[in-house]
Regions:
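Active-site beta-loop-alpha junctions enriched in small/polar residues
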Residues: 9-11, 58, 82-86, 121-123, ...
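Local cysteine-cluster metal-coordination motifs and their immediate loop/turn environment
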Residues: 248-268
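Conserved Radical SAM active-site core
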Residues: 1-90, 97, 102-113, 269-326, ...
Length: 339
């Protein structure tokens, strides 16, 4: 079994919830290796294979009316809701902040504050977005979300090569150690004042002196609480700290119409438009490329839940190829690209 992370490379709740629920109804999805498009995995989706869904979104509104389907089927899930202080120069595809705050509150009222994580992420600096600007907006958002979440996750902008040109155009500057200390020394205590704990995501810096904990991309303690069982944890150095799982869920580059300037998963607005236009929620594939033969491997899923009676809480999740004896190879002519 597995934890499905949906998704850090696109916003499924905002744009692809119809597609998601159809995949759930069909009981499987395909995952294409982005580095090797000929490698495709078939992931089974049912109560026997899925431990939990983790949704990453900036606007869950389009999905909210259908969450009862997940409740009825008995799937544990929670949301990571990114709500930042930036304008249309940085986040051109988002609704107004007041509308997003309202959506956040509605989602929290439905699920409970422990199942809606607020992400103030990434923190970036420019002539328009100064430290003082962040002080003002972080305080305002803390006040607006007080009682609707217990956790705020922050991270500082990583200047990936593919986003540098975009960030240079809005005059984003490098974050210094002094900047981090100044921001952290305000954010930690301010969030506490509103009943929240601040955690970092994939940050090497130790900010514990400012009441900020080192966090994880996916919260094992929260999931353990949802499942009512301890999890088996393992360290993953790929994100500079502790992670819960290797993300092998719904993911594809150039598919998010939010078009946030800092997003590493979008590097061609034209491709985003093309893929959005070609998208058909009725197809298991995400978008349609030219016809070609694909080699599909059915993946074995290993649960992150500790066996009953196992007192350990060392947490891991692996997606590994099945042994030759148990591996199923399927060939298909597809009229759609797989995630």
């Amino acid at each position: 079994r597995m934890i499905i992370s949906a998704s850090r490379r696109t916003d499924i709740p905002a744009f692809y919830s119809d597609w998601f629920f159809r995949r759930l109804e069909e009981g499987y999805l395909y995952v294409r290796n982005p580095m090797n498009p000929g490698q495709v995995s078939k992931i089974l989706l049912n109560q026997d294979t899925v431990d939990c869904f983790v949704f990453w979104t900036k606007d869950p509104g389009p999905m909210m009316e259908r969450l009862s389907v997940l409740d009825r089927l008995g799937y544990p899930y929670y949301f990571q809701f990114t709500l930042t202080p930036y304008g249309a120069d940085v986040e051109p595809g988002l609704p107004h902040k007041n509308e997003l705050v309202k959506t956040f509150r509605e989602l929290s009222a439905r699920l409970g504050p422990e199942r809606v994580i607020w992400r103030y992420d990434p923190v970036l600096l420019s002539p328009s977005y100064t430290r003082e600007y962040h002080f003002q907006w972080f305080s305002r958002l803390c006040s607006s979300l007080e009682g609707y979440t217990h956790t705020c996750v922050i991270s500082f902008l990583d200047m990936y090569r593919k986003i540098k040109g975009r960030m240079d155009r809005i005059q984003t500057r490098a974050m210094t150690g002094e900047d981090m200390v100044s921001l952290a020394s305000f954010m930690g205590p301010e969030a506490e004042r509103h009943g929240m704990t601040v955690r970092t995501c994939s940050e090497a810096a130790d900010l514990s002196g400012f009441h900020i904990q080192k966090g994880k991309c996916i919260d094992d303690q929260l999931i353990a609480g949802l499942l009512g069982r301890p999890l088996d944890v393992k360290k993953d150095s790929t994100e500079g700290g502790m992670r819960l799982c290797q993300e092998r869920g719904y993911r594809r580059y150039n598919t998010c119409p939010h078009l946030c300037r800092y997003c590493y998963a979008n590097f061609s607005p034209d491709q985003v438009e093309v893929k959005r236009r070609l998208h058909d929620p009725g197809l298991s594939p995400f978008v349609r490329p030219a016809h070609r033969e694909e080699r599909i491997t059915v993946r074995e899923m290993k649960s992150v839940v500790c066996p009953a009676g196992d007192g350990r809480c060392a947490l891991h999740l692996t997606f590994r190829r099945m042994g030759n004896r148990n591996r199923q190879h399927l060939k298909m002519n597809t009229d759609g690209a797989l995630i």
